[in-house]
């Protein structure tokens, strides 16, 4: 509701007191690899481990993007909320056969189930009905392709990593509907997702809340910056309901909590080259559903091969962070589950 970022973390760490110590490189490289590095190569290696991937890296978001596709349809009146779709496991798009993750098909499903069950087939049908102009306009409306303006250096440039409407093919539209064939950063997704669930308010993300002098006196407070309205409150309310269904009975059931209602969207994106069979799995979760106070976004890059398409670990991590955060912030428990 204000763009504040409480915490960021990633698996690559280094000693902040001695950032140029070669020992820091051993968390990513072997000793023999470090010994063979030239000074130029070592500088490049240090820059890689110092980089904040949440802000600086871009990747295909996968199914965490699906609520945005649905949001565009609801906001434009193309969708009413009572639609049903038949998933037979794939869509033929020109010469291409594009599969749903559920290869045998979900059968007849509702609009809310297109999100809660994460159905690619239904999302392709929705995007086709919207058309490429509406789809591309809402991508930009949610600020994908633009920098968020976060108060940290090295934010990724992603303007060239989205399809323009004029260049978007039918296959591009189909795959973009479920978060593939374009890239974004975690901070872009997190900021946009907040506007999906908070009534449509897109805030500039920031990590600094307050500036203080050397003796501890407050010099200035960083006030929230409302950038734009992305969708209506009515559309936002519907999406929260759909994403609660994801946790209650869909792909995100491992995020269920004892004391709070929760919602969210799981994501699986196959990395390029597709033939390598490697995936990014993720979960964007929030709580409580009736008045979201915390959003947690977890991304696991190239999870162990035996669980490549299993988003469960990302969901479990997000649940733990949500529970701890809600307790730390003294958020009132949900009255209704």
Can you describe what each PLM-predicted range is?
Residues 231, 306-317:
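Short alpha-helix boundary/capping segments
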Residues 302-304:
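Short beta-strand-to-loop transition segments that serve as allosteric relay/switch motifs
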């Amino acid at each position: 509701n204000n763009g504040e970022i409480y915490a960021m973390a990633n698996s690559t760490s280094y000693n902040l007191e001695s950032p140029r110590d070669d020992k820091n490189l051993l968390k990513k490289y072997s000793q023999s690899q470090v010994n063979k590095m030239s000074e130029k190569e070592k500088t490049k290696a240090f820059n890689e481990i110092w980089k904040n991937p949440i802000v600086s890296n871009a990747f295909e978001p996968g199914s965490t993007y699906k609520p945005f596709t649905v949001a565009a349809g609801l906001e434009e009146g193309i969708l009413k909320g009572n639609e049903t779709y038949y998933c037979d496991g794939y869509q033929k798009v020109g010469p291409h056969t594009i599969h749903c993750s559920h290869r045998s098909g979900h059968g007849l499903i509702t609009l809310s189930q297109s999100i809660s069950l994460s159905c690619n087939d239904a999302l392709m049908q929705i995007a086709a009905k919207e058309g490429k102009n509406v789809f591309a306009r809402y991508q930009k409306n949610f600020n994908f392709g633009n920098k968020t303006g976060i108060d940290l250096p090295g934010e990724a440039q992603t303007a060239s990593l989205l399809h323009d409407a004029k260049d978007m093919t039918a296959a591009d539209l189909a795959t973009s509907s479920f978060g593939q064939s374009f890239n974004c950063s975690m901070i872009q997704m997190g900021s946009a997702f907040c506007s999906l669930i908070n009534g449509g308010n897109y805030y500039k993300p920031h990590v600094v809340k307050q500036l203080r002098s050397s003796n501890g006196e407050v010099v200035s407070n960083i006030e929230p910056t409302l950038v734009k309205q992305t969708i209506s409150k009515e559309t936002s309310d519907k999406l929260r309901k759909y994403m609660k269904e994801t946790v209650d009975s869909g792909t995100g059931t491992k995020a269920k909590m004892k004391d709070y209602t929760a919602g969210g969207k799981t994501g699986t994106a196959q990395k390029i080259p597709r033939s390598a069979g490697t995936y990014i799995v993720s979960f964007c979760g929030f709580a409580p559903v009736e008045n979201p106070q915390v959003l947690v976004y977890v991304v696991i890059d190239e999870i162990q091969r035996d669980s490549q398409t299993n988003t469960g670990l990302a969901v479990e991590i997000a649940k733990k962070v949500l529970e701890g955060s809600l307790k730390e912030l003294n958020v009132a428990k949900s009255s209704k589950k």
